[in-house]
UniProtKB/Swiss-Prot annotation:
Disulfide links within the chain: none
Region entry Disordered, spans: 338-390, 416-445
Record key words, sorted: DNA damage, DNA repair
Name of this protein: DNA mismatch repair protein MutL
Listed Low complexity bias regions: 349-366, 416-427
Keyword Cell inner membrane: no
Record organism: Chromohalobacter salexigens (strain ATCC BAA-138 / DSM 3043 / CIP 106854 / NCIMB 13768 / 1H11)
Keyword Signal: no
InterPro entries in alphabetical order: DNA_mismatch_repair_CS, DNA_mismatch_repair_MutL, DNA_mismatch_S5_2-like, HATPase_C_sf, MutL/Mlh/PMS, MutL/Mlh/Pms-like, MutL_C, MutL_C_dimsub
GN (gene name): mutL
Biological process per Gene Ontology, one example term: mismatch repair
Job of this protein: This protein is involved in the repair of mismatches in DNA. It is required for dam-dependent methyl-directed DNA mismatch repair. May act as a 'molecular matchmaker', a protein that promotes the formation of a stable complex between two or more DNA-binding proteins in an ATP-dependent manner without itself being part of a final effector complex.
Any Pfam family: HATPase_c_3
Family listed: Belongs to the DNA mismatch repair MutL/HexB family.
Length: 644
């Protein structure tokens, strides 16, 4: 005989331990919660001490506002907080913590001691102690400077099952250090100290000046990150994105150097990850992950941070706006990375340049006279634009290279790829025009990639610059140039497939779809039309594809439509069609670019260098491999022990 179990209220001690299972996973979780409380208290200096990776001891000390004596017992109670008092406060919360669960959860699985003082006199401090399931905290006087100290000993001492899941001391400290890194990157105006087993691991000074910020980023992520990163600062539509994004050539095998903050809170969000992945799509080597430290600032009322137990996920009121802002900002910044004539301090290395960082930098450069080599290139490009419409740029580019050395026309550039692109776009072929190579000028400012001096094994171009030697992979560089010209012809300036020739299907493709997919297809009809796809609703669970772009060829239309609908539902946009078309253009550009063992004349090599300087994303080929590298005179001198 079975008995029905009656519903009852959980014992407070059991409820706290259940909550601890969500909040307290390992020592790093404790550090995160305690430090966030210290930040919310207005601290200017935070010290963290650990023993045995945090399993034996965690101490967090701050110089914040402190907690009143009367509030100390409440601080260890569930759902007790000073940070919000109403639903309106929750909807616009700007503090890191607000649920009032952290200290109660931590104290239920450890021996916790909290000492705090709200006055400047050290003798005015008070201590409250809680141990495991002991729910009657004891408050006693204790000297302490203004601020608070939280000491957590013997984590999971009363839950052996949880304690045995802890890893080695080194592993647990690694997780704590990563949590510290994220917290220290969130607030540059706070000084930080991290000690492990009484040894200082990190000591960071407070400072919100740009140099202080870069110094902290370099200390936490390494100088190599800063040397291979772009600083961005972009503001639009009530959103501001600033921080550092790594160059495509500075990537990692794991996504372990990706830090994204929303209003000072570190988050891991699918929408953000998708936007960043899209921005790097054309320039990142397959299987690699970008590195970045980015900060998004927006009105707290348009973002919900109360959607995850550890607050790692957020929900934006207008996810499509945020996604498009992130994508367009990063896409533009990465597209503008090109060889720059200025060098880093010491003159040893060339630095990438982008006009997407700040408006003041762009305005400052606008008033400066362009060097002669750049004026000539711009004049040539402008003249070609007046003579021919933009739809002919692919053929114009390829014809220009053939005109440089007509006796090698067949081996330099085969016409098939460009003709395929023109056929897809529905444009006639213009007559060929020459693009004369840039001759060496008398200007004191040489072009960033210098002037070609030789070709090595028919593969690499050797160029002399003001700083030293540049080596260019001519096939990879030409592949990127050709690819960008093809994309420009097909997509145009707005990345919309408006010029793309479409074809009606002789037999419409019937697609079985869910009710949600049908609803998305109806709502996004204009989006599909803009992409050259005619998609009709034929029934409550059926879609019909009547027209697709010509370039899709024999693609799996049904799978593509399902993927696009999924993206539109989750992220508010889909780039599946563009990706598929760009893959075809990339393959065409690869086969249509100058091959290894093709001997180029010096004018041809210089023409290629000038085109690299004018082409977006020319630092990487279509597959994400670097197209050029540089060795400074200092590096060359070191090889031969000159000046030793």
């Amino acid at each position: 005989m079975t008995h029905t179990r009656r519903i009852h209220i959980l014992d407070p001690r059991l409820a706290n331990q259940i909550a601890a299972g969500e909040v307290v996973e390992r020592p790093a979780s404790v550090v995160k919660e305690l430090v966030e409380n210290a930040i919310d208290a207005g601290s200017q200096r935070i010290e963290i001490d650990l023993e045995s990776g945090g399993a034996r001891l965690i101490r967090v000390r701050d110089d914040g506002r402190g907690i009143d004596q009367e509030d100390l017992p409440l601080a260890l109670s569930r759902h007790a907080t000073s940070k919000i008092a109403s639903l309106d406060d929750l909807e616009g919360v700007d503090s890191l913590g607000f649920r009032g669960e952290a200290l109660a959860s931590i104290s239920s699985v450890s021996r916790l001691e909290l000492i705090s003082n709200t006055h400047d006199e050290p003798s005015d401090g008070w201590r409250v102690v809680a141990e495991g399931r002991q729910m009657e905290p004891r408050v006693t006087p204790a000297p302490h400077p203004r601020g608070s100290s939280v000491v957590v000993r013997d984590l999971f001492f009363n839950t052996p099952a949880r304690r045995k899941f802890l890893r080695t001391e080194k592993t647990e400290f690694g997780h704590v250090e990563e949590a510290f890194r994220r917290l220290a990157l969130s607030r540059y105006d706070i000084g930080w100290i991290l000690r492990h087993n009484q040894k200082v691991v990190h000591q960071l000074r407070a400072g919100d000046a740009s140099t202080s910020m870069e110094r902290r980023v370099g200390a936490l992520l390494g100088r190599k990150f800063l040397e291979n990163a772009l600083h961005v600062d972009i503001e639009a539509t009530g959103l501001r994105l600033w921080g550092w994004v790594g160059l495509p050539t500075h990537s990692r095998a794991q996504a372990d150097q990706q830090y994204f903050f929303v209003n000072g809170r570190v988050v891991r969000d699918r929408l953000v990850a998708h936007a960043v992945r899209q921005a790097y799509r054309d320039v990142m080597f397959h299987g690699r992950h970008p590195v970045f430290v980015l900060y998004l600032e927006l009105d707290p009322h348009v973002v919900d941070v109360n959607v995850h137990p550890t607050k790692h996920e957020v929900r934006f009121r207008d996810g499509r706006l945020v996604h498009d802002f992130l994508f367009s900002s990063l896409h533009r910044a990465l597209a503008d990375v090109r060889p720059n004539a200025t060098s880093t301090e010491g003159g040893d290395e060339a630095t990438p340049s982008t006009d997407a960082t700040t408006a003041t930098a762009a305005e400052a450069s606008a008033g400066q006279a362009e060097p002669r080599w750049q004026q000539q290139g711009m004049a040539l490009a402008a003249g070609q634009e007046r003579e021919r419409p933009a739809a002919h740029r692919v053929r114009e580019f390829m014809a220009g290279y053939r005109a440089l050395h007509p006796e090698h026309e067949a081996s330099l550039l085969t016409p098939q790829p460009q003709e395929a692109a023109e056929e897809a776009a529905g444009t006639p072929a213009p007559p060929a025009s020459s693009s004369p190579a840039m001759a060496e000028t008398d200007d004191t400012q040489a072009p960033p990639l210098g002037y070609a001096v030789a070709q090595l094994h028919g593969v690499y171009i050797l160029s002399q610059t003001e700083r030293g030697l540049v080596v260019v992979d001519m096939h990879a560089a030409h592949e990127r140039i050709t690819y960008e010209r093809m994309k420009q012809q097909v997509h145009g300036d707005g990345q919309a497939l408006g010029r793309l020739q479409t074809q009606p299907l002789l037999v419409p493709v019937s697609i079985a779809a869910s009710a949600r997919e049908v609803e998305t297809a109806e709502n996004e009809r204009a989006t599909f039309e803009r992409l050259g796809v005619e998609l009709d609703v034929a029934g409550p669970e059926t879609l019909l594809v009547r027209q697709v772009p010509v370039l899709l060829g024999n693609a799996d239309v049904e799978a593509l439509i399902h993927d696009m609908l999924g993206d539109l539902e989750r992220f508010g946009r889909s780039d599946r069609l563009e990706v598929h078309i760009n893959e075809l253009l990339s393959s065409m550009a690869c086969h249509g670019s100058v091959r290894a063992n093709r001997r180029l004349t010096v004018p041809e090599m210089n023409a290629l260098l000038r085109d690299m300087e004018r082409t977006e994303r020319s630092g990487q080929c279509n597959h994400g491999r670097p197209t050029w590298t540089e060795m400074s005179m200092h590096e060359l001198d070191k090889l031969f022990l000159r000046g030793q």
